[in-house]
């Protein structure tokens, strides 16, 4: 068979002659096979419906990315006997065209070239297909059209609505369930050794068939409840677990959780979401599962546990100290300096492999980069042992890390091969319901591991304005959660008794009033921010302005902590990119190879700070880019303030000169050269929660900590406190003054502010340590050791992002939250570092909220998000809440009450 690419083109005249000859043959064959030329009333009605369908197909095909051969306009739709034969003739010609020129939808995925035999065959010009090979005017669809669902060269990603079959292929939605399955991916033998196919075909990404969906829904609803608590023999279960090698006894609620995990692995789901509240023992329940449910297959025996970097050694210690030496598990840490570049066979010799999300993302990026290059090059394939290994069980700790399904880590987790899959997260839903889909996709929970079904049944209906649609979607969501998620909170009671006895937790909200001079400056900042918001919404949501809007939010929040945090970063000095004729001409002069390199980028990572960019700035003509903050540092002045076009600066990558008119942003680049792969990330940034977007901005703050502290040390004589810093000082002194030797955690999102708190503590002769993202793993470990073992160290200053997960800090019983965070789950996780199993003292939490500022509005946003999680996981109310939208954004800036 010849492939489509080998099919010889014909002249227009020859093509028309063949069409006419084929039409005459089809007409004769059609007439000879018809018992009567007069159509019945029912067939006439079907005829009209089909005619309308084809007319719509013709209309839609004009905008298709793959245009069909030109045809004259169809005859009249009036199904009379005089015009019927002409109409049939035109339709048969049309069907033959679809047969010989199949529609191939575009794809954003890069597939490995396959053999020509995998493509549908094209008949030669001399052969005339029989009437049986042409789709008739019935509701059925021929199995000879495999291309409408894509091929190995053009796979369709079912998670991307853009890749679904468009109407120009004339296949209707009702017929979609009867289409043939996609062609299989190319065999691994056709790939270079050591590579992973990037084909989007996966077992869970298949065409949706109603009968399969019904069957899968029935399977989903089976085994959806754990065994009743009072029917479990706790003593017998504990004996079984301890005989398997566990050194500690499980608490009653942990025995129940372990039993549920065992039952889920025995069901068709092969895993689930263990969503116990922070501090209830998800780790020990998982270790018990590893011991009691070991693999019997020596070729697939290894468990992969994916954690954050901060938890690597904690998991290793738990696996070492909680398991009897005679049953000890062999553990290998696949990360950093301990990584030995083992291949998949060597990894499969261990019982447990510990790795990190960043390591998975790195392997995914390396593999994609290799597959996107020419396979004929001599570049050796990268080592992707995690992707190549067949795992027995995969456990994602803090699984909400992959809640964004478009990140490299999430994509890599989905591609991993395993028999059983588990998600451990106390907050499986944080900002919106769509985050839960990423966990379902990893778990391959059918049928909702396909985005089109999840969106149709749950995601989109929850955003409806009709109460009945919302109620139905909420019921479906709760059934789905009940079938896949097992969750207990610290307030859960069994037989009218709490499942765990913890000391009481008291949360105190402390209102902070700005000083008069601070209030005047804050009002100035708010006015500038409001003008930016007005410009943003009045300019059709210009992406180039969106980054400035986020920065303005950041500055307002920083000001509430201390004016010095924004003293050198006023909104008026924001770095701006101008759209001018010179800029566009510079874009047009880009080298084609440079354009191709930019277009294939998967992520916008700044070449200076290596952080993801909200609005990257490209340098012409080299095509390298940085984030706006780094470019502002490079040029050393506010953009556009210079009277000359020359800026004395060098590209950080190639050391070429940077000229003012040679700086462009991604939106201008796209307007001239078309869509970029990486612009998908910019669109994603628009839909992400504010917490995720601002965390990118905050990473830059960590990089200037040392410079800020050095500068601050020289200005010690100019030291000036703030209203919030005064409140923190008074609260800490009151706790220490009680002389109970109680320790304190001080959380803040801003590392610069922690520098100010540190200086204040030094002035008060209070010993303290720090724990933030700027410190190495060894430095963090030293801080933890000092805080836990040195009685004189009473305070630990903790970055909210770095210290909100994985730590056990029950040595402290006071928590001070210096400012509110958009995502309340992050705050809850930070508090649970203290209020968890092992805590012996009452816990007090102080939440500082600056009065009549943006912080009060953030608290209001927090309430909505808490309500969302409550409705999804606990409540029976029917009022879902969506993600932050335009109205909430206006509300944050005080432009909407």
Curated annotation (Swiss-Prot):
Keywords tagged on the record: ATP-binding, Cytoplasm, Helicase, Hydrolase, Metal-binding, Nucleotide-binding, Nucleus, Zinc, Zinc-finger
Family: Belongs to the SNF2/RAD54 helicase family.
Alphabetical list of SUPFAM superfamilies matching this protein: P-loop containing nucleoside triphosphate hydrolases, RING/U-box
The keyword Cytoplasm is annotated on this UniProt entry: yes
Chain positions recorded as ATP binding sites: 276-283
Cellular compartments annotated: Cytoplasm; Nucleus
Zn finger (RING-type) location: 606-655
Name of this protein: Uncharacterized ATP-dependent helicase C17A2.12
């Amino acid at each position: 068979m010849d492939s489509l690419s080998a099919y010889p083109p014909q002249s227009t005249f020859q093509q028309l002659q063949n069409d006419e000859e084929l039409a005459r043959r089809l007409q004769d064959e059609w007439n000879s096979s018809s018992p009567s030329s007069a159509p019945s009333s029912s067939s006439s009605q079907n005829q009209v419906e089909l005619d309308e369908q084809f007319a719509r197909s013709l209309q839609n095909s004009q905008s298709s990315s793959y245009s069909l051969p030109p045809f004259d306009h169809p005859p009249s739709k009036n199904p009379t006997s005089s015009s019927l034969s002409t109409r049939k003739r035109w339709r048969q010609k049309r069907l033959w065209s679809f047969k010989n020129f199949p529609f191939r939808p575009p794809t954003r995925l890069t597939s490995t070239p396959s053999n020509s035999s995998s493509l549908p065959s094209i008949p030669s010009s001399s052969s005339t297909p029989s009437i049986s090979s042409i789709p008739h005017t019935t509701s059925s669809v021929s199995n000879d059209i495999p291309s409408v669902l894509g091929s190995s060269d053009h796979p369709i990603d079912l998670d991307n609505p853009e890749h679904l079959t468009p109407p120009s292929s004339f296949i209707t939605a009702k017929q979609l369930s009867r289409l043939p399955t996609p062609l299989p991916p190319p065999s691994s033998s056709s790939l270079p050794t050591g590579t992973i196919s990037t084909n989007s075909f996966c077992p869970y990404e298949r065409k949706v068939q109603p009968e399969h969906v019904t069957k899968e829904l029935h399977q989903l609803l089976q085994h959806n409840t754990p065994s009743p608590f009072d029917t479990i023999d706790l003593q017998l279960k504990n004996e079984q677990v301890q005989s398997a090698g566990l050194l500690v006894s499980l608490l009653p609620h942990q025995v129940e959780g372990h039993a549920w995990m065992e039952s889920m692995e025995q069901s068709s789901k092969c895993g689930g979401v263990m969503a116990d509240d922070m501090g209830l023992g998800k780790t020990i329940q998982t270790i018990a599962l590893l011991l009691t449910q070991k693999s019997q297959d020596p070729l697939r025996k290894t468990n992969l546990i994916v954690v954050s970097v901060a938890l690597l050694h904690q998991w290793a210690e738990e696996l070492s100290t909680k398991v009897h030496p005679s049953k000890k598990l062999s553990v290998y840490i696949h990360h950093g300096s301990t990584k030995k570049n083992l291949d998949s066979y060597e990894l499969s010799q261990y019982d447990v492999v510990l790795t990190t999300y960043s390591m998975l993302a790195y392997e995914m990026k390396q593999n994609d980069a290799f597959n996107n290059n020419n396979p004929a090059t001599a570049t050796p394939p990268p080592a992707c042992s995690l992707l190549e290994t067949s795992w027995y069980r995969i456990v994602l700790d803090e699984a909400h890390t992959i809640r964004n399904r478009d990140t490299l880590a999430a994509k890599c987790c989905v591609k991993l091969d395993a028999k059983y899959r588990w998600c451990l997260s106390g907050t499986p839903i944080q900002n919106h319901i769509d985050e839960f889909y990423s966990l379902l996709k990893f778990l391959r929970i059918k049928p909702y591991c396909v985005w089109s079904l999840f969106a149709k049944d749950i995601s989109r209906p929850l955003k409806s304005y009709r109460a009945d649609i919302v109620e139905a979607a909420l019921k479906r969501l709760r059934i789905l959660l009940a079938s896949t998620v097992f969750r207990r909170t610290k307030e859960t009671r069994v037989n009218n008794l709490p499942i765990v006895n913890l000391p009481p937790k008291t949360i105190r909200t402390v209102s902070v009033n700005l000083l008069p001079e601070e209030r005047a400056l804050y009002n100035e900042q708010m006015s500038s921010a409001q003008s930016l918001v007005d410009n943003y919404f009045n300019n059709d949501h210009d992406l180039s302005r969106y980054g400035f809007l986020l920065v303005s939010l950041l500055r307002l929040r920083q000001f509430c902590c201390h004016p010095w945090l924004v003293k050198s970063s006023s909104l008026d000095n924001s770095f701006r990119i101008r759209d001018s004729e010179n800029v566009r001409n510079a874009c047009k002069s880009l080298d084609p190879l440079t354009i191709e390199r930019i277009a294939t980028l998967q992520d916008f990572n700044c070449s200076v700070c290596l952080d993801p960019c909200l609005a990257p700035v490209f340098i012409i003509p080299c095509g390298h880019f940085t984030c706006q903050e780094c470019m502002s540092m490079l040029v050393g002045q506010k953009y556009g303030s210079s009277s000359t076009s020359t800026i004395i600066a060098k590209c950080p990558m190639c050391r070429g000169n940077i000229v003012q008119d040679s700086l462009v942003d991604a939106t201008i680049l796209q307007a001239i050269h078309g869509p970029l792969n990486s612009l998908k990330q910019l669109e994603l940034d628009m839909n992400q929660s504010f917490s995720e977007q601002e965390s990118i901005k905050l990473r830059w703050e960590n990089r200037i900590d040392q410079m800020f502290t050095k500068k601050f040390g020289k200005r010690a004589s100019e030291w000036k406190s703030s209203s919030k810093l005064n409140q923190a000082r008074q609260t800490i002194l009151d706790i220490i003054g009680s002389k109970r030797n109680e320790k304190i955690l001080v959380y803040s999102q801003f590392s610069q502010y922690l520098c100010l708190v540190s200086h204040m503590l030094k002035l008060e002769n209070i010993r303290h340590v720090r724990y933030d993202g700027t410190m190495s793993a060894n430095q963090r470990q030293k801080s933890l050791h000092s805080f836990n073992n040195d009685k004189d160290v009473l305070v630990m200053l903790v970055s909210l992002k770095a210290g909100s997960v994985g730590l056990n800090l029950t040595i402290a019983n006071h928590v001070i939250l210096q400012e509110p965070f958009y995502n309340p789950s992050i705050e809850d996780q930070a508090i649970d570092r203290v209020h968890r199993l092992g805590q012996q003292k009452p816990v007090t939490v102080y939440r500082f909220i600056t009065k009549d500022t943006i912080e009060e509005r953030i608290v209001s946003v927090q309430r909505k998000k808490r309500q969302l999680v409550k409705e999804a996981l606990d409540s029976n109310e029917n009022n879902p809440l969506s993600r932050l939208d335009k109205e909430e954004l206006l509300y944050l800036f005080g432009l909407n009450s």
